[in-house]
From Swiss-Prot:
Ranges of compositional bias, category Polar residues: 1-18
Protein name: Small ribosomal subunit protein uS5
Domain S5 DRBM: 48-111
Domain notes: The N-terminal domain interacts with the head of the 30S subunit; the C-terminal domain interacts with the body and contacts protein S4. The interaction surface between S4 and S5 is involved in control of translational fidelity.
InterPro entries (UniProt xref): Ribosomal_Su5_D2-typ_SF, Ribosomal_uS5, Ribosomal_uS5_bac-type, Ribosomal_uS5_C, Ribosomal_uS5_N, Ribosomal_uS5_N_CS, Ribsml_uS5_D2-typ_fold_subgr
Length: 226
């Protein structure tokens, strides 16, 4: 009686490497992942900080049923004083986010900063949402909720106090934060308009921290020259 044949799936692997088909499929798959990673990690994406604040699903009722689409509220900034907000809508979530990123880049604006914080207190409004921002001394951190924090992080503000009132809708809060940041003025311009010295406009702890930063930079420069 002949011995039963061993199944292909349960037989012991051969001593050689993987078959040509397996090597081809694995090679294509690994190569595709590497190429995809290079595209996602391009220079254009690395220079910006992106934060997806909220994603909503929208349903449209038509004769044949309901058609679903997605909206994405995205904040984009360089982490160094430039920030923008975009709103994208598409049938797929990644496409909606990509559209929001592109719109946010079109809405970039500069934010005045002093030693990682804002130069003065400010209030912003959008619809029923109200956001208050106040300067904070170095080391305080960003005291803010999710939507406000997303905008401040992308703008490169590291020390600030915030309070949001009224509407809790993320879209209103984000636009109120943007309105507050757009209402900021450079300390030198405020001092010149009021006829006051700069020390009377900027809080003392921030000025002292700024002076220490300049002294440290000068010390490092002198050490490097020597």
């Amino acid at each position: 009686m002949a011995a039963p044949q061993r199944s292909r799936t349960t037989g012991a692997p051969s001593s050689g490497g993987p078959s040509e088909n397996e090597r081809g499929r694995g090679g294509d798959r690994r190569g595709g992942d590497r190429r995809g990673g290079d595209r996602r990690g391009g220079d254009d994406r690395n220079q910006f900080v992106e934060r997806v604040v909220t994603i909503n699903r929208v349903a449209k009722v038509v004769k044949g049923g309901r058609r679903f689409s997605f909206t994405a509220l995205v904040v984009v900034g360089d982490g160094d004083g430039t920030v923008g907000v975009g709103y994208g809508k598409a049938k797929e979530v990644p496409t909606a986010i990509a559209k929001g990123v592109e719109e946010a880049k079109k809405n970039f604006f500069r934010v005045p900063r002093i030693q990682g914080t804002i130069p003065h207190s400010v209030r912003g409004e959008a619809a029923a949402g109200v956001v208050f921002l106040r300067p904070a001394s170095p080391g305080t951190g960003v005291i803010a909720g999710g939507p406000v924090r997303a905008v401040l992080d992308c703008a490169g503000i590291h020390d600030v106090l915030s309070k949001s009132l009224g509407s809790s809708n993320a879209i209103n809060i984000v636009h109120a934060t943007v309105a507050a940041l757009q209402g900021l003025e450079e300390p030198a311009a405020v001092a010149a308009r009021r006829g006051l010295p700069l020390e009377d406009v900027v809080p003392g702890p921030i000025l002292r921290a700024q002076a220490r930063g300049r002294a440290d930079a000068a010390a490092k420069a002198s050490t490097g020259v020597a």
